[in-house]
């Protein structure tokens, strides 16, 4: 399942904006094995629209009928740093993001990953799902 959420302050109907930008967001594989150390996320942007992004990427496990963050193995060294932003001079056709999973307990189940981008005051939230067997 891939979802794209596009938010622009003060604008309720963003269907026209979604038509103007075509972004594909996909996990490298649909199914991973237990204790996979990393996953790669690819975002293709076949437009010349520059997108800003930070280090943030959210990872969730489907548990008890809701999406929950997975349990971390050791939280004593965890540093959260996602307030920075990057903008590349020319819009690349393909972005690749690597997400380390070896810090988490990754049991079998259904997962989703989210990555946010922005363009001025507009925010794009991309989501994709995968499975661990």
Predicted regions and their residues:
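Primarily secretory-pathway and cell-envelope proteins
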Residues: 1-79, 116-133
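Short, solvent-exposed, Trp/other aromatic-anchored flexible loops in extracytoplasmic proteins
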Residues: 73-110, 116-120
């Amino acid at each position: 399942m891939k979802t794209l959420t596009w938010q622009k302050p003060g604008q309720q109907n963003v269907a026209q904006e979604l038509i103007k930008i075509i972004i594909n967001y996909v996990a490298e594989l649909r199914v991973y094995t237990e204790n996979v150390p990393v996953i790669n996320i690819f975002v293709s942007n076949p437009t010349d629209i520059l997108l800003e992004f930070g280090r943030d990427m959210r990872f969730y496990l489907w548990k008890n009928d809701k999406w929950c963050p997975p349990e971390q193995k050791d939280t004593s060294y965890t540093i959260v740093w996602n307030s920075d932003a990057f903008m590349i001079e020319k819009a690349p056709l393909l972005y690749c993001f690597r997400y380390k999973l070896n810090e988490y307990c990754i049991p079998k189940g259904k997962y989703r990953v989210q990555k946010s981008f922005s363009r001025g005051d507009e925010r794009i939230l991309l989501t994709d799902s995968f499975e661990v067997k």
